[in-house]
Amino acid sequence: MMKSRMYDSTKLSFIRLLKLFEDSIDDVVAITRAFSIAYVIHRGKFYDNIKSEPYINHTLRVALILANELKVKDRDVIIAAILHDAFEKTYTNTFKEELLKKTIGEKALNLILSTTKFNIKEMESNEYCKLVLKSSQIVRYLILANRLDSIRILKNSIRKDKIQRFKKETQEYFLPIANLTDDNLVFKLSVAMYELK
């Protein structure tokens, strides 16, 4: 399934992730299956058009933030992190919901769908925060881990407009959500924001 050259950073991130679940062969198999799907979906895509940064690395980092930094050991949550962008409209090689449900299970699929129903660009900050705060804590973890990785990777970006937009959105939307979700996430987001200066 993975014929094209895989970047060393991708391999290392995937190995780090699997090591966190090495006590359960079922978890390793399920996470590997999700990674294979994500690899197909994101093949040829690069994060922020940086040719040295395959998009799949972003999804792996989100999974690692959850599993390693936040100590989330639920494989369905990790699968949802790996596949959180599976339904991006810009992708031509997206998987259908029914096929994903059969492959990764209903819980993981529902987590993915729960994280994608909030469109930050179409809502006011109060409305967005209220809707996200009504979701489960684990959905908020997924949303915040995604934002945390996006902020961390931006410190290497030359796009000042994107940096300013993400800083503003994080301040208005994500820090208030993190404040009502997990102090550790507030700290991590605040540090990442500070490092953008």
What are these regions (language model features)?
Residues 2-197:
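Active-site helical microenvironments for divalent-metal-assisted chemistry
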